[in-house]
Amino acid sequence: MAHTMRVEVVSAEEEIFSGEAEFVALPGESGELGILPGHTPLITRIRPGAVRIKIAGQAEDEFVFVAGGILEVQPHGVTVLADTAIRGADLDEAKAAEAKRLAEEALVNKESKIDYAQAQAELATAIAQLAAIQRLRQKR
């Protein structure tokens, strides 16, 4: 069995990460997923949260925030097709906190004509982004 696998993290806008990795952890729809080289093929939806990539030969893990998407696992590679993806180093805590505040206000305001499902999705994404920022801080 190989010790590394090819990992691709892409969004509609750009390729966020492409390289060899020893391990990938990410938030699956049913819970946290850990992928090692040679993993059984799998296609599943992913929830908003942090993707942690253990890069071969590096002490520091790579972090990418994804706002949901699809995970495809093949024996020699992993592809994350994210709705939105942001490199861990590019996460903006103030912006995420403001998005959370606005989504909470929209859900509380009974007189506004909002799409509650959309507001709830935006709130979940903002909360997941803030949690990813906290995780990234703990790792450093």
Swiss-Prot record:
Pfam families assigned: ATP-synt_DE, ATP-synt_DE_N
Subcellular location: Cell inner membrane
UniProt entry keywords in alphabetical sequence: ATP synthesis, Cell inner membrane, Cell membrane, CF(1), Hydrogen ion transport, Ion transport, Membrane, Transport
A cellular component term, taken from the record's GO annotations: plasma membrane
Membrane topology of the entry: Peripheral membrane protein
GO molecular function: ATP binding; proton-transporting ATP synthase activity, rotational mechanism
Purpose: Produces ATP from ADP in the presence of a proton gradient across the membrane.
Subunit structure: F-type ATPases have 2 components, CF(1) - the catalytic core - and CF(0) - the membrane proton channel. CF(1) has five subunits: alpha(3), beta(3), gamma(1), delta(1), epsilon(1). CF(0) has three main subunits: a, b and c.
Family label: Belongs to the ATPase epsilon chain family.
HAMAP family: ATP_synth_epsil_bac
PANTHER family noted in UniProt: ATP SYNTHASE DELTA/EPSILON CHAIN (PTHR13822), ATP SYNTHASE EPSILON CHAIN, CHLOROPLASTIC (PTHR13822:SF10)
Protein name: ATP synthase epsilon chain
Organism classification: Bacteria, Pseudomonadati, Pseudomonadota, Betaproteobacteria, Burkholderiales
